[in-house]
Curated annotation (Swiss-Prot):
GO terms for biological process: pantothenate biosynthetic process. Mg(2+) binds at residues 66, 105, 137. 3-methyl-2-oxobutanoate binds at residues 66-67, 105, 135. It holds the Pfam family Pantoate_transf. It catalyses: 3-methyl-2-oxobutanoate + (6R)-5,10-methylene-5,6,7,8-tetrahydrofolate + H2O = 2-dehydropantoate + (6S)-5,6,7,8-tetrahydrofolate. Residues 1-23 are annotated as: Disordered. Its cofactor is Mg(2+). Keywords: Cytoplasm, Magnesium, Metal-binding, Pantothenate biosynthesis, Transferase. Belongs to the PanB family. It is found in: Cytoplasm. This is 3-methyl-2-oxobutanoate hydroxymethyltransferase. Binds 1 Mg(2+) ion per subunit. GO terms for cellular component: cytoplasm.
């Protein structure tokens, strides 16, 4: 079978090239991407169906975030969500994403007490949830926990800058690392890298500071409200796809209106059922 070029002339059909099999993304793949200057995207996921779609789209890292507290369970902050509420979500995401690296958030209260508590929490996510790595919030103050987890063979993604679990002590949703506070943010980044974290999320950090930190670290940086020069970017998928209600954060770009489409579909479905239009003959046995 022939194909046509842009001018309409037939071209000989080319033999199909075998597709390169995709393999599971591992932490060393992210390190290689940083070394080669390749930027990559990370999204949150909380269930099998969306994880499957994102995996098919080639998203290399999926985060089962404690943001599930807000978008799955309806809490006002991430503070109330528990390990028992998150582990079933991790299981679904791992099943739906055969290629992505699946990272599980350690929720508030599960690791602050020290290395032993962090190891107990992380072990549950790895054994019961099937996660490939865990994420925890904090810089220098959690370096000991990070070192303990990595020594136990558990890959750790760190999270500095604005840390949502600390929203009460930070005085609300505020940019971190401005002015004199920049030195502490840099110190936090260096501390988590030296403790063995394989990557670090920087949230709501001035773009210039994030660029500086990205250049200092050998591990990948992942930005959310931290400018364009991080090695990766992450968004909550409901924000990215237009499922969230209310005003979006400044760092969010909506790439679709899934919420509007779903609302229209549900409205049309209800209308057709009420009108006796659905199910039609073609939907019957």
């Amino acid at each position: 079978m022939s194909e046509h070029n842009v001018y309409g002339a037939a071209q000989p059909a080319q033999p199909a090239q075998p597709a390169q099999p995709r393999t599971r993304i591992r932490t060393h793949h992210l390190q290689k991407m940083k070394a080669e200057g390749h930027k990559w995207a990370m999204l949150t996921a909380y269930d099998y169906s969306t994880a499957r779609i994102f995996d098919e789209a080639g998203i290399p890292v999926l985060l089962v975030g404690d943001s599930a507290a807000n978008v799955v369970y309806g809490y006002d902050t991430t503070v109330p969500v528990s390990i028992d509420e998150l582990i079933p979500l991790v299981r679904g995401v791992v099943r739906g994403a055969p290629h992505a690296l699946v990272v599980a958030d350690l929720p508030f209260g599960s690791y602050e007490a020290g290395p032993a508590a962090a190891l107990a929490a992380a072990t549950r996510f790895m054994k019961e949830g099937g996660a490939h790595a865990v994420k925890l919030e904090g810089g220098e103050r959690v370096a000991e926990q990070i070192a303990h987890l990595t020594a136990a063979g558990i890959p750790v993604m760190a999270h500095i800058g604005f840390t949502p679990q600390s929203v009460n002590s930070l005085g609300g949703f505020r940019v971190q690392g401005r002015g004199d506070a920049a030195e502490q943010t840099i110190a936090d980044a260096i501390a988590v890298a030296e403790a063995g974290a394989f990557s670090v999320v920087m949230e709501m950090v001035p773009a210039g500071l994030a660029t500086q930190i990205t250049g200092k670290l050998t591990i990948p940086t992942i930005g959310i409200g931290a400018g364009p020069n991080c090695d990766g970017q992450v968004l909550v998928w409901q924000d990215m796809a237009g499922m969230s209600s209310g005003k979006s954060a400044r760092f969010v770009k909506r790439f679709a209106d899934i919420g509007g489409e779903l609302r229209r579909a549900a409205t049309q479905y209800a209308h057709e059922v009420a009108a006796g239009v659905f199910p039609a003959d073609e939907h019957c046995f």
